[in-house]
Amino acid sequence: MPHTGSQHTLQATPKTAQHTGAQKAPEQAIALKKEQQLKNQEGATSHRKAHTEGCHTQKTRMSADKAGLRHRQGSGEVRARTASTRVEGECSSDGVVMMFCMPARGEEEKASGEARGEDVGSSRESRQGTAHKSTCMHTEAASLQKAGEIGKVEDAKT
C-alpha cells in the first residue's frame, strides 16, 4: 500500500509542474504579443507620416497641373477608381505607396474654371478624404473642416 501511495505522489508531481508551466506560457506569449503590437503601431505611425508627407507633395503637384496629366515616379503605379474620383499612386523603390487623387471626368471640366477655384479645391479635398479613408489620416480632418463649404458646392451644382 505505501508503495502505491508513493507512486501516486511521483506521478502527481510532474503533472502539476506541467500544468503550472502551461499556465505561465500564455502570460509570456501575451507579453510578447503586446510588445509586437507596440512595435507594429510605431511602424504604422512612421509609415503614415511618410505617406502624409508624400501625399502633400503629390497633391500640390496635381493641383498645379491644370491639364490633369499624371506624374510617374518610382518603380510602379497603383490605381483605383471610385464613382467621383480617380485615385492613382506611386510605388517607390522601398515599397511605400504614395497616393494622389485626380478628379473624375465631370470634375476635370469644373476644375479648369478658375473663377470657382476655392469651391473646387474644397470639394476635391472632401473626395480625397473619402478615397483615402483607410490609408491617409490627414485628409479626414480637412474634409470635416470644409464640410460646410462642400454642402454649398453641391447645391451650386444642381
Swiss-Prot record:
Segments of this protein annotated with the region Disordered: 1-89, 107-158
Superkingdom of source: Eukaryota
UniProt feature, compositional bias: Polar residues: 1-21, 128-137
Composition skew (Basic and acidic residues), residue ranges: 51-68, 107-127, 149-158
Name the UniProt record assigns to this protein: Uncharacterized protein ECU01_0010/ECU01_1600/ECU04_0010
